[in-house]
Amino acid sequence: MITELEMGKGESELELGLGLSLGGGTAAKIGKSGGGGAWGERGRLLTAKDFPSVGSKRAADSASHAGSSPPRSSSQVVGWPPIGSHRMNSLVNNQATKSAREEEEAGKKKVKDDEPKDVTKKVNGKVQVGFIKVNMDGVAIGRKVDLNAHSSYENLAQTLEDMFFRTNPGTVGLTSQFTKPLRLLDGSSEFVLTYEDKEGDWMLVGDVPWRMFINSVKRLRVMKTSEANGLAARNQEPNERQRKQPV
Protein backbone atom coordinates (compact mmCIF):
# COMPACT_ATOMS: atom_id res chain seq x y z
CA MET A 1 0.00 0.00 0.00
CA ILE A 2 2.79 2.38 0.82
CA THR A 3 4.51 1.39 -2.33
CA GLU A 4 1.48 2.26 -4.43
CA LEU A 5 1.12 5.67 -2.72
CA GLU A 6 4.76 6.45 -3.24
CA MET A 7 4.47 5.37 -6.82
CA GLY A 8 1.40 7.57 -7.32
CA LYS A 9 3.17 10.50 -5.73
CA GLY A 10 6.15 9.89 -7.95
CA GLU A 11 3.95 9.83 -11.01
CA SER A 12 2.24 13.06 -9.99
CA GLU A 13 5.63 14.75 -9.75
CA LEU A 14 6.78 13.32 -13.07
CA GLU A 15 8.00 16.08 -15.32
CA LEU A 16 8.32 15.88 -19.10
CA GLY A 17 11.01 18.13 -20.50
CA LEU A 18 11.48 19.03 -24.21
CA GLY A 19 14.55 20.76 -25.46
CA LEU A 20 16.80 21.16 -28.49
CA SER A 21 20.51 20.79 -28.64
CA LEU A 22 20.74 24.06 -30.63
CA GLY A 23 21.07 25.72 -27.24
CA GLY A 24 19.20 28.09 -25.05
CA GLY A 25 15.81 26.37 -25.33
CA THR A 26 13.39 26.29 -22.35
CA ALA A 27 11.65 23.13 -21.22
CA ALA A 28 7.91 22.74 -21.13
CA LYS A 29 6.73 21.04 -17.99
CA ILE A 30 3.60 18.97 -18.18
CA GLY A 31 1.94 17.47 -15.08
CA LYS A 32 -0.40 14.55 -15.35
CA SER A 33 -2.50 15.36 -12.33
CA GLY A 34 -3.43 18.92 -13.15
CA GLY A 35 -6.38 18.19 -15.48
CA GLY A 36 -7.32 20.76 -18.12
CA GLY A 37 -6.37 23.75 -15.99
CA ALA A 38 -3.02 22.30 -15.13
CA TRP A 39 -2.42 21.62 -18.83
CA GLY A 40 -3.20 25.23 -19.72
CA GLU A 41 -0.82 26.49 -17.02
CA ARG A 42 2.07 24.11 -17.58
CA GLY A 43 1.77 23.05 -21.22
CA ARG A 44 2.20 25.39 -24.29
CA LEU A 45 3.55 25.27 -27.83
CA LEU A 46 7.15 26.17 -28.48
CA THR A 47 7.68 29.33 -30.55
CA ALA A 48 10.64 31.22 -32.05
CA LYS A 49 10.98 33.13 -28.79
CA ASP A 50 12.06 29.91 -27.11
CA PHE A 51 15.03 29.73 -29.55
CA PRO A 52 16.61 33.21 -29.56
CA SER A 53 19.85 32.13 -31.21
CA VAL A 54 18.07 30.47 -34.13
CA GLY A 55 15.75 33.43 -34.61
CA SER A 56 18.64 35.89 -34.54
CA LYS A 57 20.52 33.86 -37.14
CA ARG A 58 17.56 33.76 -39.50
CA ALA A 59 16.95 37.48 -39.08
CA ALA A 60 20.60 38.23 -39.80
CA ASP A 61 20.53 36.01 -42.93
CA SER A 62 17.38 37.73 -44.17
CA ALA A 63 18.87 41.18 -43.58
CA SER A 64 22.12 40.31 -45.39
CA HIS A 65 20.19 38.81 -48.32
CA ALA A 66 17.99 41.88 -48.56
CA GLY A 67 21.04 44.17 -48.52
CA SER A 68 22.95 42.25 -51.21
CA SER A 69 20.09 42.01 -53.77
CA PRO A 70 17.73 45.00 -54.09
CA PRO A 71 14.12 44.29 -54.98
CA ARG A 72 13.58 43.80 -58.72
CA SER A 73 11.23 46.21 -60.40
CA SER A 74 8.80 44.99 -63.02
CA SER A 75 9.91 47.78 -65.35
CA GLN A 76 13.58 46.90 -64.98
CA VAL A 77 13.59 43.72 -67.02
CA VAL A 78 11.60 42.97 -70.17
CA GLY A 79 11.61 40.10 -72.63
CA TRP A 80 13.44 36.83 -72.50
CA PRO A 81 16.34 36.50 -72.19
CA PRO A 82 16.09 39.49 -69.84
CA ILE A 83 17.06 42.83 -71.46
CA GLY A 84 17.47 46.02 -69.46
CA SER A 85 14.85 48.66 -70.17
CA HIS A 86 17.54 51.23 -70.99
CA ARG A 87 19.01 48.86 -73.56
CA MET A 88 15.57 48.19 -75.04
CA ASN A 89 14.99 51.96 -75.34
CA SER A 90 18.39 52.33 -76.98
CA LEU A 91 17.54 49.65 -79.55
CA VAL A 92 14.22 51.33 -80.34
CA ASN A 93 15.89 54.74 -80.74
CA ASN A 94 18.60 53.29 -82.97
CA GLN A 95 15.97 51.66 -85.18
CA ALA A 96 14.05 54.93 -85.48
CA THR A 97 17.24 56.83 -86.32
CA LYS A 98 18.17 54.24 -88.94
CA SER A 99 14.74 54.48 -90.58
CA ALA A 100 14.94 58.28 -90.67
CA ARG A 101 18.43 58.12 -92.18
CA GLU A 102 17.28 55.66 -94.87
CA GLU A 103 14.35 57.90 -95.79
CA GLU A 104 16.65 60.92 -96.01
CA GLU A 105 19.11 59.05 -98.24
CA ALA A 106 16.27 57.82 -100.45
CA GLY A 107 15.01 61.40 -100.81
CA LYS A 108 18.47 62.67 -101.74
CA LYS A 109 18.87 59.89 -104.29
CA LYS A 110 15.51 60.72 -105.86
CA VAL A 111 16.39 64.41 -106.11
CA LYS A 112 19.75 63.50 -107.62
CA ASP A 113 18.09 61.24 -110.20
CA ASP A 114 15.63 63.99 -111.12
CA GLU A 115 18.39 66.52 -111.71
CA PRO A 116 19.60 66.88 -115.31
CA LYS A 117 22.74 64.87 -115.88
CA ASP A 118 25.86 66.74 -116.82
CA VAL A 119 27.16 65.37 -120.10
CA THR A 120 30.57 67.03 -119.71
CA LYS A 121 33.61 65.40 -118.19
CA LYS A 122 37.33 65.98 -118.13
CA VAL A 123 39.94 63.61 -119.57
CA ASN A 124 43.60 64.57 -119.09
CA GLY A 125 42.53 68.09 -118.15
CA LYS A 126 40.41 68.57 -121.31
CA VAL A 127 36.65 68.89 -121.34
CA GLN A 128 34.92 65.88 -122.90
CA VAL A 129 31.25 66.39 -123.76
CA GLY A 130 30.28 63.44 -125.93
CA PHE A 131 27.12 63.14 -128.01
CA ILE A 132 24.25 65.60 -127.60
CA LYS A 133 20.82 65.74 -129.23
CA VAL A 134 20.10 67.95 -132.23
CA ASN A 135 16.60 68.77 -133.47
CA MET A 136 15.44 70.89 -136.38
CA ASP A 137 12.14 72.69 -136.85
CA GLY A 138 10.06 70.87 -139.44
CA VAL A 139 11.94 67.58 -139.04
CA ALA A 140 10.29 64.99 -136.80
CA ILE A 141 13.37 62.82 -136.26
CA GLY A 142 16.26 64.21 -134.27
CA ARG A 143 19.94 63.42 -134.57
CA LYS A 144 23.02 63.34 -132.36
CA VAL A 145 26.36 64.99 -132.83
CA ASP A 146 29.69 64.41 -131.08
CA LEU A 147 31.03 67.73 -129.82
CA ASN A 148 34.39 66.14 -129.06
CA ALA A 149 34.94 65.81 -132.81
CA HIS A 150 34.62 69.57 -133.34
CA SER A 151 36.94 72.39 -132.41
CA SER A 152 35.01 75.52 -133.45
CA TYR A 153 31.55 76.89 -134.20
CA GLU A 154 32.20 76.89 -137.95
CA ASN A 155 33.13 73.23 -137.91
CA LEU A 156 29.99 72.35 -135.91
CA ALA A 157 27.69 74.39 -138.17
CA GLN A 158 29.11 72.73 -141.28
CA THR A 159 28.48 69.28 -139.79
CA LEU A 160 24.86 70.15 -138.98
CA GLU A 161 24.24 71.54 -142.47
CA ASP A 162 25.55 68.33 -143.99
CA MET A 163 23.51 66.26 -141.53
CA PHE A 164 20.12 67.88 -142.08
CA PHE A 165 20.22 69.24 -145.62
CA ARG A 166 22.45 66.93 -147.62
CA THR A 167 22.43 63.40 -146.18
CA ASN A 168 18.96 63.16 -144.62
CA PRO A 169 16.36 61.80 -147.09
CA GLY A 170 13.57 63.35 -145.03
CA THR A 171 14.83 66.87 -145.78
CA VAL A 172 14.98 66.66 -149.57
CA GLY A 173 12.13 69.12 -149.84
CA LEU A 174 13.89 71.58 -147.58
CA THR A 175 17.14 71.25 -149.50
CA SER A 176 15.48 72.13 -152.79
CA GLN A 177 14.37 75.46 -151.35
CA PHE A 178 17.96 76.72 -151.08
CA THR A 179 20.33 77.32 -153.96
CA LYS A 180 23.35 77.92 -151.70
CA PRO A 181 24.62 76.24 -148.52
CA LEU A 182 22.91 77.31 -145.31
CA ARG A 183 24.66 79.81 -143.08
CA LEU A 184 23.40 78.90 -139.60
CA LEU A 185 25.72 81.30 -137.84
CA ASP A 186 25.58 84.52 -139.82
CA GLY A 187 21.78 84.94 -139.99
CA SER A 188 21.63 84.84 -143.80
CA SER A 189 19.27 81.86 -143.96
CA GLU A 190 15.80 80.99 -142.73
CA PHE A 191 17.27 78.92 -139.91
CA VAL A 192 19.57 79.73 -137.02
CA LEU A 193 21.49 77.45 -134.65
CA THR A 194 20.52 77.66 -130.96
CA TYR A 195 21.32 75.66 -127.85
CA GLU A 196 19.88 75.00 -124.37
CA ASP A 197 22.24 75.59 -121.46
CA LYS A 198 22.32 73.81 -118.11
CA GLU A 199 19.96 76.38 -116.59
CA GLY A 200 17.28 75.58 -119.16
CA ASP A 201 17.64 78.83 -121.16
CA TRP A 202 17.78 78.88 -124.96
CA MET A 203 20.71 80.86 -126.36
CA LEU A 204 22.09 81.63 -129.81
CA VAL A 205 25.13 79.57 -130.73
CA GLY A 206 28.23 81.75 -131.04
CA ASP A 207 27.51 84.30 -128.32
CA VAL A 208 30.15 82.90 -125.92
CA PRO A 209 33.65 81.44 -126.40
CA TRP A 210 33.82 77.84 -127.58
CA ARG A 211 35.11 76.39 -124.32
CA MET A 212 32.35 78.05 -122.35
CA PHE A 213 29.83 76.77 -124.88
CA ILE A 214 30.83 73.12 -124.60
CA ASN A 215 30.79 73.39 -120.78
CA SER A 216 27.20 74.66 -120.70
CA VAL A 217 25.42 73.10 -123.70
CA LYS A 218 22.78 70.39 -123.11
CA ARG A 219 21.24 70.08 -126.59
CA LEU A 220 21.08 71.87 -129.95
CA ARG A 221 18.19 73.05 -132.07
CA VAL A 222 18.11 74.36 -135.63
CA MET A 223 15.36 76.93 -135.14
CA LYS A 224 13.53 79.12 -137.61
CA THR A 225 14.83 82.66 -137.55
CA SER A 226 11.33 84.05 -137.03
CA GLU A 227 11.05 82.09 -133.75
CA ALA A 228 14.54 83.03 -132.61
CA ASN A 229 13.93 86.78 -132.69
CA GLY A 230 13.19 86.79 -128.94
CA LEU A 231 16.60 85.38 -128.08
CA ALA A 232 19.59 87.51 -127.15
CA ALA A 233 20.83 89.68 -130.02
CA ARG A 234 24.08 88.63 -131.58
CA ASN A 235 27.06 90.81 -132.13
CA GLN A 236 28.20 89.50 -135.48
CA GLU A 237 31.77 90.84 -135.60
CA PRO A 238 32.98 89.55 -132.20
CA ASN A 239 31.15 86.28 -132.74
CA GLU A 240 32.82 85.72 -136.09
CA ARG A 241 36.22 85.83 -134.40
CA GLN A 242 35.04 83.41 -131.66
CA ARG A 243 33.60 80.92 -134.15
CA LYS A 244 36.76 80.70 -136.20
CA GLN A 245 39.04 80.48 -133.18
CA PRO A 246 40.13 76.84 -132.62
CA VAL A 247 40.27 75.21 -129.21
Curated annotation (Swiss-Prot):
Principal subcellular localisation of the protein: nucleus
Q: Where in the sequence does UniProt note compositional bias of the Low complexity kind? A: 62-75
Q: Per the Swiss-Prot or TrEMBL record, what residue ranges does the short sequence motif EAR-like (transcriptional repression) cover?
A: 14-18
In the induction comment, the record states: By auxin.
- Transcription regulation is among the record's keywords: yes
Record field: compositional bias (Gly residues): 25-40
Annotated signal sequence is: none
Q: Which Gene3D superfamilies match?
A: Phosphatidylinositol 3-kinase Catalytic Subunit, Chain A, domain 1
Q: Which family does it belong to?
A: Belongs to the Aux/IAA family.
Domains: entry comment? The N-terminal half of the protein contains two conserved domains I and II. Domain I includes a slightly degenerated ERF-associated amphiphilic repression (EAR) motif which seems to be involved in the activity of transcriptional repression. Domain II is required for the correct degradation of the protein through the SCF-mediated ubiquitin-proteasome pathway. Interactions between Aux/IAA proteins and auxin response factors (ARFs) occur through their C-terminal dimerization domains III and IV.
Q: What's the protein called, per UniProt? A: Auxin-responsive protein IAA13
Organism of derivation:
Arabidopsis thaliana (Mouse-ear cress)
Q: What is the lineage of its organism?
A: Eukaryota, Viridiplantae, Streptophyta, Embryophyta, Tracheophyta
